[in-house]
């Protein structure tokens, strides 16, 4: 994805960047800059900003002096945390337990992103949600399904990494079945906990997400694209995504209950 900064809504900017699989295929990544109600800013996830994008960020944040926090929501998005902290050292650094484990020398805030205390700190600006029926980090670290989803209340913009997929890319990714529609990440079957009730926990979480975030206006998905939403379209899209993973959930119930 091109390294650009795009204003998606009032107070919400999406920064896209490159992540190459095998050094060849660019699947893209994202970070978001969000203005708080008090006029200050936070980052959602980290990225090493190219000079033109950093100039835009610094113009908005007064060279970073108005940047309160860097909130790293996906446990496997760790490549750019050190650069982000070194560039904006006065911003409080938040991460998941895996961020703390993999980058122990960074000055992480004690509150971890998977803890309810994060909403206590930023709940006026964001709603947060984590998929149920699975761990945030699976034993198989090739499975990147789960993450902390964030909804910017003012703009209705959802920042999500991996859990929800919306592809709008050229070949060869255009050949994938999830292209052009909002879907759950294809590793759901590997992400579900091997225990009774996990499939139902996930289904109930997804239904609740669709209801609670029904007024979302767009989904900004890492590696992928932005899906603009019609009025209360999100519950319908979540219902469709659930329908497509019904065989996965049924197989899990048959094996574990």
Residue ranges and their predicted role:
Residues 38-39, 64-67, 90, 154-156, ...:
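A general structural motif
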Residues 1-38:
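Zn-dependent metallo-beta-lactamase
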Residues 18-19, 38-51:
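Glycine-rich phosphate-binding "P-loop"
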Residues 25-27, 52-58, 168-174:
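A short, polar/proline- and glycine-enriched secondary-structure boundary/capping micro-motif
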Residues 1-6, 48-63:
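A glycine-rich beta-to-alpha transition motif near the start of alpha/beta enzyme domains, typified by
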Residues 59-123, 238-244:
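Active-site HxH/HxHxD metal-binding segment of metal-dependent hydrolases
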Residues 4-7, 10-13, 43-49, 97-256:
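Metallo-beta-lactamase
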């Amino acid at each position: 994805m091109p390294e650009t900064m795009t204003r998606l809504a009032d107070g919400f900017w999406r920064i896209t960047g490159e992540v190459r699989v095998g050094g060849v295929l660019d699947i893209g990544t994202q970070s978001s800059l969000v203005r708080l109600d008090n006029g200050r800013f936070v980052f959602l996830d980290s990225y090493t900003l190219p000079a033109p994008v950093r100039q835009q960020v610094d113009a908005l944040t007064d060279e970073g002096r108005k940047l309160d926090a860097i909130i790293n929501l996906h446990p496997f998005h760790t490549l750019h945390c050190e650069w982000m902290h070194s560039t904006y050292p006065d911003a409080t650094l938040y991460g998941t337990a895996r961020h703390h484990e993999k980058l122990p020398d960074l000055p992480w805030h004690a509150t971890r992103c998977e803890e309810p205390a994060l909403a206590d700190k930023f709940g006026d600006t964001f709603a947060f949600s984590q998929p149920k029926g699975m761990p945030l980090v699976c034993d198989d670290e090739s499975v990147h399904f789960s993450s902390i989803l964030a909804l910017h209340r003012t703009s209705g913009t959802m920042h999500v990494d991996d859990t929800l997929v919306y592809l709008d890319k050229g070949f060869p990714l255009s050949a994938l079945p999830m292209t052009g529609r909002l879907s759950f990440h294809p590793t759901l079957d590997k992400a579900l906990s091997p225990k009774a009730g996990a499939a139902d926990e996930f289904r109930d979480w997804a239904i609740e997400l669709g209801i609670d975030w029904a007024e979302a206006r767009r989904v900004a998905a890492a590696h992928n694209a932005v899906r603009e939403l019609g009025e209360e379209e999100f519950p319908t899209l979540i219902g469709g995504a659930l329908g497509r993973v019904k065989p996965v959930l049924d197989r899990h119930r048959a094996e574990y209950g």
